[in-house]
Amino acid sequence: MSATGPTTHRPGGTRYVAYGASVALVAMAVAITLALPQEIREQVTIEQAVTLYASVGAFVLILHGIGRSRVTVTDEELEVVNGFRTRRVPWTQVKGFAFGEGDPWPTLVTHDDERVKLFALQGTSGRARVRVIVDDLVRRVP
């Protein structure tokens, strides 16, 4: 393998949708709150308000997990961030990659037969683009 420096791949449209939806969700919650007449807002209990904003916060957190997904490739390892879980897999443990027709994203397969989804490489971002990246990863397998 040649020393080319780290390369990071992130989901394209999926990332924009996740963060765009987060902004829209927060904006809608604030707009609805401000648009309610004062007499209605006074009837909302603390528990109801906390439930609403905790739900919005949970959705934003989930969407952030989707948006932060990435695959970083170095000469030593693959770093896979799926949601809030990070996996570092040395190239010596990589057996191969699977990306069949109709698969939403590629899967890294280790010598222990463990499978790690590469969520950052979304097929919806363009199968040909993802196929080029997967082919490059396959060439790096020792």
Q: Which residue stretches match the model-derived regions?
A:
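N-terminal membrane-targeting/pre-transmembrane regions
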Residues: M1-V44
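Alpha-helical transmembrane spans of integral membrane proteins, capturing the lipid-embedded, hydrophobic core
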Residues: S22-A24, Y53, G57
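Hydrophobic alpha-helical transmembrane segments
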Residues: Q43-A54
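Conserved beta-hairpin
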Residues: S55-W91
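A broad, low-specificity signal marking well-ordered, structured residues that form hydrophobic/aromatic
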Residues: V71, P106, V116
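C-terminal halves and exits of single transmembrane alpha-helices
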Residues: F84-T107, D112
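A membrane-cytosol interface segment of integral membrane proteins
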Residues: T110-P142
